[in-house]
């Protein structure tokens, strides 16, 4: 998508590079105010169809995870639906797909607020993300959260609700899905499932 509306420069204090198919005049004027910031115009290209990883004395060639589930394919599993959060949920889902597992991502107003990455448990990834948001002074109230794989226990959504998250997206598929759904219902969160995990190691 071309960047058309001029974002407030204060929203991106640490962003040094923006890549977009285009920038309108207002967006360019705002984004170019920061010294040494790079604005790169580039049309999207085709992604590789496979990935290659070294494995001991050989290589592992596997299909690349190029898919992304559209909002119309999601299932709302809770009593509360938040269609107004769909844009942030999709944005968070795209980010979490490219982050090392176990991982969760918080997003609001199409901005990454924090991510917890590469943890041995999902709840540790969530705690890491909450702590990062606090350290940067980012308010998680009204934010959306994406997880690269299912929640094994309801503690993740409970902690997310305590942090201010209002909507969650995850693949689903845990034997404890109902417990996480019940925890969301008890706290007024919306939960969407995609049926597809984006596990990355």
Question: Could you tell me what each predicted segment is?
Answer:
Residues 18-201:
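ATP-dependent carboxylate/acyl-activation modules
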Residues 2-6, 11-17:
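Short, small-residue-biased leader/transition segments that mark boundaries at the very start
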Residues 1-2, 114:
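Residue-level detector of alpha-helix boundaries and kinks
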């Amino acid at each position: 998508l071309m960047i058309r509306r001029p974002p407030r420069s204060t929203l991106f204090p640490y962003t040094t590079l923006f890549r977009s198919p285009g920038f309108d005049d207002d967006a360019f004027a705002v984004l170019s105010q920061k010294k040494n910031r790079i604005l790169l115009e580039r049309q999207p290209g085709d992604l590789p169809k496979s990935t290659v990883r070294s494995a001991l004395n050989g290589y592992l060639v596997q299909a690349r995870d190029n898919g992304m589930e559209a909002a119309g394919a999601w299932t709302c599993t809770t009593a509360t639906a938040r269609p107004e959060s769909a844009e942030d949920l999709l944005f968070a889902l795209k980010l979490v797909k490219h982050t090392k597992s176990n991982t969760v991502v918080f997003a609001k107003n199409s901005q990454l607020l924090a991510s917890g990455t590469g943890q041995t448990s999902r709840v540790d990834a969530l705690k890491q993300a909450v702590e990062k948001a606090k350290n940067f002074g980012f308010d998680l109230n009204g934010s959306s959260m994406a997880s690269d794989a299912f929640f094994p226990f309801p503690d993740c959504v409970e902690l997310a609700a305590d942090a201010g998250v209002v909507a969650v997206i995850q693949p689903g598929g845990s034997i404890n899905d109902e417990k996480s759904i019940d925890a969301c219902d008890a706290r007024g969160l919306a939960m969407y499932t995609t049926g597809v995990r984006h596990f990355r190691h």
